[in-house]
């Protein structure tokens, strides 16, 4: 059996978002596991995936150190970062990301 480690991150609740699904979904996946069926053609049948959920503070100063600590502790094969976009009407994949610290609202430290 192949074993894989995954880290899935989501942001803590913030102003205007009392419960952030971007952190609740990773927590649920970590607790419940991935739904592997007993069908012989299930691609996850011979794969054990351990999911580590990490809640990221809404803070420019603390977000990366929190995620980095989890990555170093768990040594994942994959890291999936999630977020909440109010205008989205479902699950969306980012086509590109910009490493730019800009926000309309202040972060948790301000």
Over which residues does each language-model region extend?
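N-terminal catalytic or cofactor-binding beta/alpha core of small enzyme domains
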Residues: 1-110
């Amino acid at each position: 059996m192949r074993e894989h480690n995954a880290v899935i991150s989501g942001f803590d609740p913030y102003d205007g978002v009392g419960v952030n699904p971007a952190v609740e979904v990773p927590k649920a996946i970590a607790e419940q596991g991935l739904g592997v069926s007993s069908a012989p053609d299930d691609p996850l049948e011979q794969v054990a995936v351990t999911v580590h959920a990490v809640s990221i503070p809404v803070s420019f100063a603390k977000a990366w150190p929190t995620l980095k600590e989890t990555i170093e502790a768990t040594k994942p094969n994959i890291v999936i970062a999630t977020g909440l976009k109010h205008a989205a009407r479902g699950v969306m994949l980012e086509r590109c990301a910009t490493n730019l610290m800009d926000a309309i609202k202040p972060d948790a430290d301000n």
